[in-house]
Structure formats: structure tokens, C-alpha cells
């Protein structure tokens, strides 16, 4: 990675799988790579210590917790972020059913032997994962990223090649309507790239 690394996972657990990843992310942050991580608070409620994001931020890793759990105050507790995404420089994306926890590499047998699927994607389709991550990041942090920077800095143009199709997931989150910038961007994308929705 030379520009950015984005990770978004439902479950993260400190251990043999995640700890070496943190070391790599910390090193990349020291090299000037923008590193961002999103985790779901309920997904990690039994696997991470409270305010884990502060430990990562001390290592130069920008971190956001999706929909923090507030007992007795949260009526939207079931609104969870089940995505499992890694994006590197907008050129490579990983996704699938695996989370960043030892049970996914069978270091811990929580439910017996575990085998999950994952894929590595390259090319123009990676932009879809980049923009999905940025929309979620902007929603959680109430910020507004310059999407053109991430697209133009790292995505090779494919000329007249056919764009990849993807399934919009904003219906699974409560992004639209709560973050005006994200809502505007989603509407703009539907107008500019209707074949993607």
C-alpha cells in the first residue's frame, strides 16, 4: 500500500490473526499511508476491550466504531454493519464471509472446524468497495471525504471496458437521511452511474 488501506469488519478479535495485521497497519501509517478501520460495536462486544479504537489511534490507525451499543438507550441496536471489506489503494479489495478473529483461521474452535470463503478483486470494481467504505466512514464520523481524491489517485482507467455490477447496500444501514453529505453523494451516484444501482 502506498496511499490508503481501508478495513471494515463485523468481528475483530485480538490474537494470532489480527495482531500481526495491526503491526503491518501501524508500520504503513508510519510510512504515511492513510489507514482507516471500522468495526461493529455489537459484533466486537465480547472480543474487544471498551474504547479499543483509542489503542489503534495511538498507533496512527484512524478508527471508527459503528453504532456503539448503549444499554437501555439504543432502540436501533439491531442496525449492524456486517460488511467484511479490505481495500488497498483502490486497486485491490478483499471480501467474503471471514472476519478478523482467530476462529476464522481455526486457532480457536468456537463452533468446530471453520472454513469460510473470501475473494480478492482487482480492477474497476474495487471503486465500489472504496466508495461503500467512504460512505460508511463519513456517516459514522460525520465527515465528508473528497471521493475524487481516492478515485483519481489510484484507480486505473479501463477505457471502454464494461463496468462491474454491484448491489447497493445502503438499505441495510441507516445512512440515508442521517448524513446529508452521504445522502447527496448516493443520489448523485444514482444519476451519474444508474447501471450501478
Question: Where are the predicted features?
Answer:
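Charged, low-complexity intrinsically disordered terminal segments
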Residues: 1-197
Amino acid at each position: 500500500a502506498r496511499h490508503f488501506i481501508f478495513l471494515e469488519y463485523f468481528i475483530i478479535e485480538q490474537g494470532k490473526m489480527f495482531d500481526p495485521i495491526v503491526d503491518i497497519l501501524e508500520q504503513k501509517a508510519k510510512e504515511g499511508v492513510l489507514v482507516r478501520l471500522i468495526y461493529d460495536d455489537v459484533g466486537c462486544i465480547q472480543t474487544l476491550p471498551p474504547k479499543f479504537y483509542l489503542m489503534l489511534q495511538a498507533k496512527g490507525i484512524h478508527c471508527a466504531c459503528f453504532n456503539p451499543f448503549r444499554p437501555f438507550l439504543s432502540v436501533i441496536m439491531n442496525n449492524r454493519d456486517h460488511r467484511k471489506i479490505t481495500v488497498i489503494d483502490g486497486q485491490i479489495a478483499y471480501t467474503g464471509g471471514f472476519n478478523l478473529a482467530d476462529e476464522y483461521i481455526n486457532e480457536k474452535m468456537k463452533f468446530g472446524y471453520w472454513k469460510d470463503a473470501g475473494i480478492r478483486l482487482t480492477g474497476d470494481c474495487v471503486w465500489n468497495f472504496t466508495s461503500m467504505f467512504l460512505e460508511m466512514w463519513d456517516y459514522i464520523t460525520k465527515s465528508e471525504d473528497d471521493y475524487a481524491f481516492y478515485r483519481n489517485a489510484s484507480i486505473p482507467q479501463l477505457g471502454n471496458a464494461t463496468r462491474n455490477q454491484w448491489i447497493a447496500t445502503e438499505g441495510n444501514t441507516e445512512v440515508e437521511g442521517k448524513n446529508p453529505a452521504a445522502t447527496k453523494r448516493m443520489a448523485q451516484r444514482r444519476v451519474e452511474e444508474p447501471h450501478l444501482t
